[in-house]
């Protein structure tokens, strides 16, 4: 199976899963964010070692700071605010509907599966930071790190 077929298969499975199960709850979104944080922290030394092996001349401290610890503020912010970000927003209804008793609101809904292509110059950071927003919004992701970007 080639990369195109593999990605199509993953996309098909994720779409079917989302249609079957619907939008994830806020608690599940927070759980995904916490698991993402744990995954990054549990593997931070492996990430840094792999980056050093790939780039050869990058400081391990710089990689740890930019590629690993640079992700944590985004995750912490999302965990703290995901409930607020997903609240229904009441809006005023336009004339003449407002005077007729109409109610207007904005309800944010996930798209389902989101495609994400990340470049390779800061591979850990640029692959994981977008996942924070994707998971907080209740979406799933098909991620591809482009080797020539």
What are these regions (language model features)?
Residues 145-149:
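Conserved small/polar residues in nucleotide/adenosyl-binding loops
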Residues 140-141:
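A short hydrophobic/small-residue beta-strand
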Residues 111:
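Phosphate-coordination loops involved in phosphoryl transfer and adenosine-cofactor binding
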Residues 119-128:
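Conserved coil-to-alpha-helix start sites within the AMP-binding
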Residues 1-103:
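N-terminal Rossmann-like NAD(P)+-binding subdomain of aldehyde/semialdehyde dehydrogenases
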Residues 135-136:
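Short hydrophobic alpha-helices that are characteristic scaffold elements of the AMP-binding
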